[in-house]
């Protein structure tokens, strides 16, 4: 199934049914009085997180969703039937944003979590409500109110504890295959991974975390090179970034230069995201002769001036991967325990997450607008090149036909 992580839809709740003006007519009951029932409430629209849904592709093709209108009231004080609610299922990790105001309506992070995005209209009142001591036969009734109408944007960000970062062909997909049951495509050409992949990593029987593999970045991604930065937003909910470095790139490029390029692109996209804890993994050690591995790895670290945690692995041979898994599991558990035990730290983490969410959303929207503007400019330029007489000059040798009516 095609992976779609963003969609814009319009939702319209059902209108309320109308109240009616009716009078009781029954044998042996003179002056029966009003008995008009109320209209039914219009159906509302809800969005619900669902573990069995993994993409927003359904909402790329069905963009207008409407709930049922409430039924009108009837005599004998019968209230009209309420309109049926509509429940839209989306993947866990979906954020709902009002496109007009930019406000976040809801953030669905748990299976079954539900948010109302459009409220159904209230049913109208029947004439029973308007009887009084001075007006015993009211003919007044009211119509139902309109249902809420909204345009909303659905944004999916995968939920993972660890995010894999690196150049194309750095070995990210091979690494996640080695440490989890995920089976992303692996090949010897760039951009084999086109969509994010999730894998559950088991440190031991009762300890596990989720790892996300996103498509590779290249230098200039912030300006749209390669697959651009559209998938970087999926790292916004991770706790730790695992930077995979190919120590012997197939194109002969410098590993340290590649790593610096990735860090620069990350900082351009979101300085807050770049402040997440980063663990360095020097991968594909099997490509280097054993006697020169240590020297070459130290050269890369010296070039990067790296002082943080670093591991040396071969994802293909599954060498050194267990040590990475145990380290990540310990770090994640420490973070979780501290959030539970220290309310002040938990509040800081929440504020950091909110800032990161807002920053990645703004950058993603800005990048899309810039891409659209670039494509529009390219189309205009192409049109000008194709039209030899675009400037309306009379001296360019074109033939002009003039039709005259006799």
Swiss-Prot record:
Residue ranges of the region described as Disordered: 120-143, 381-406
GO biological process, one term: ribosome biogenesis
Subcellular location: Cytoplasm
Chief localisation class: cytoplasm
Binding residues for GTP: 166-173, 191-195, 213-216, 283-286, 314-316
Residues of the OBG-type G domain: 160-333
Family to which this protein belongs: Belongs to the TRAFAC class OBG-HflX-like GTPase superfamily. OBG GTPase family.
Purpose of the protein: An essential GTPase which binds GTP, GDP and possibly (p)ppGpp with moderate affinity, with high nucleotide exchange rates and a fairly low GTP hydrolysis rate. Plays a role in control of the cell cycle, stress response, ribosome biogenesis and in those bacteria that undergo differentiation, in morphogenesis control.
Name of the protein this chain belongs to: GTPase Obg
Organism, as annotated: Acinetobacter baumannii (strain SDF)
Lineage: Bacteria, Pseudomonadati, Pseudomonadota, Gammaproteobacteria, Moraxellales
């Amino acid at each position: 199934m095609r992976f779609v992580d963003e969609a814009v839809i319009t939702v319209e709740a059902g209108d309320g049914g109308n109240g009616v003006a009716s009078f009781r007519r029954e044998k042996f009951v003179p002056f029966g009085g009003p008995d008009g029932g109320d209209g039914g409430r219009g159906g509302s629209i809800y969005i619900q997180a669902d573990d069995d849904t993994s993409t927003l592709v359904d909402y790329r093709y069905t963009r207008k969703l409407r709930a049922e209108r409430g039924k009108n009231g009837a005599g004998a004080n019968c209230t009209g039937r309420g309109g049926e609610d509509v429940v839209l299922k989306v993947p866990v990790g979906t954020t709902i944003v009002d496109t007009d105001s930019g406000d976040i309506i809801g953030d669905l992070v748990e299976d079954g979590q539900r948010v109302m995005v459009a409220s159904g209209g209230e049913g109208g009142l029947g004439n029973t409500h308007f009887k009084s001591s001075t007006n015993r036969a009211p003919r007044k009734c009211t119509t139902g109110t309109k249902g809420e109408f909204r345009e909303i944007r659905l944004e999916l960000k995968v939920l993972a504890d660890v995010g894999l970062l690196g150049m194309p062909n750095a070995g990210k997909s091979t690494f996640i295959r080695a440490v989890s049951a995920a089976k992303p495509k692996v090949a010897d050409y760039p951009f084999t991974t086109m969509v994010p992949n999730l894998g559950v990593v088991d440190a031991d029987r009762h300890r596990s975390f989720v790892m996300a593999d996103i498509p590779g970045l290249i230098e200039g991604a912030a300006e749209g090179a390669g697959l651009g930065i559209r998938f970087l937003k999926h790292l916004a909910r991770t706790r730790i970034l695992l930077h995979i470095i190919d120590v012997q790139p197939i194109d002969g490029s410098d590993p340290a230069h590649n790593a610096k390029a990735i860090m620069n692109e990350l900082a351009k996209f979101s300085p807050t995201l770049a402040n997440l804890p980063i663990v360095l993994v020097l991968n594909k050690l099997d490509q280097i002769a054993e006697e020169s591995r240590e020297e070459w790895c130290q050269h890369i670290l010296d070039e990067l001036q790296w002082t943080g945690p670093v591991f040396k692995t071969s994802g293909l041979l599954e060498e050194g991967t267990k040590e990475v898994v145990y380290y990540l599991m310990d770090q994640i558990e420490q973070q979780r325990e501290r959030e539970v035990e220290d309310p002040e730290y938990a509040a800081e983490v929440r504020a950091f997450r909110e800032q990161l969410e807002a920053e990645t959303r703004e950058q993603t929207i800005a990048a899309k607008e810039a891409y659209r503007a670039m494509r529009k400019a390219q189309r205009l330029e192409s049109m000008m090149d194709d039209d030899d007489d675009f400037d309306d000059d009379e001296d360019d040798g074109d033939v002009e036909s003039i039709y005259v009516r006799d």
